Amino acid sequence: MEAGAYLNAIIFVLVATIIAVISRGLTRTEPCTIRITGESITVHACHIDSETIKALANLKPLSLERLSFQ
């Protein structure tokens, strides 16, 4: 194997490893939890769309905690 081809192979492996590490770090998130009690609904670390918001509002809780948009 030529020196240039060998160097290209090493660079390819390094770049692939870096991409794998970065993508694994980006996908590591907290689990989505929705806790519903008689008095409140707590939403944590969830991607919420308009249909989910309407469904939660239809439950008519006394309070809706930790609701955030991402």
Swiss-Prot record:
<keyword id="KW-1043">Host membrane</keyword>
<dbReference type="GO" id="GO:0044167">
    <property type="term" value="C:host cell endoplasmic reticulum membrane"/>
</dbReference>
<keyword id="KW-0916">Viral movement protein</keyword>
<protein>
    <recommendedName>
        <fullName>Movement protein TGBp3</fullName>
    </recommendedName>
</protein>
<keyword id="KW-0812">Transmembrane</keyword>
<keyword id="KW-0472">Membrane</keyword>
<comment type="similarity">
    <text>Belongs to the Tymovirales TGBp3 protein family.</text>
</comment>
<dbReference type="Pfam" id="PF02495">
    <property type="entry name" value="TGBp3"/>
</dbReference>
<dbReference type="GO" id="GO:0016020">
    <property type="term" value="C:membrane"/>
</dbReference>
<dbReference type="InterPro" id="IPR003411">
    <property type="entry name" value="TGBp3"/>
</dbReference>
<keyword id="KW-0813">Transport</keyword>
<comment type="function">
    <text>Plays a role in viral cell-to-cell propagation, by facilitating genome transport to neighboring plant cells through plasmosdesmata. May induce the formation of granular vesicles derived from the Endoplasmic reticulum, which align on actin filaments.</text>
</comment>
<feature type="topological domain" description="Cytoplasmic">
    <location>
        <begin position="28"/>
        <end position="70"/>
    </location>
</feature>
<feature type="topological domain" description="Lumenal">
    <location>
        <begin position="1"/>
        <end position="4"/>
    </location>
</feature>
<feature type="transmembrane region" description="Helical">
    <location>
        <begin position="5"/>
        <end position="27"/>
    </location>
</feature>
<keyword id="KW-1133">Transmembrane helix</keyword>
<keyword id="KW-1038">Host endoplasmic reticulum</keyword>
<dbReference type="GO" id="GO:0046740">
    <property type="term" value="P:transport of virus in host, cell to cell"/>
</dbReference>
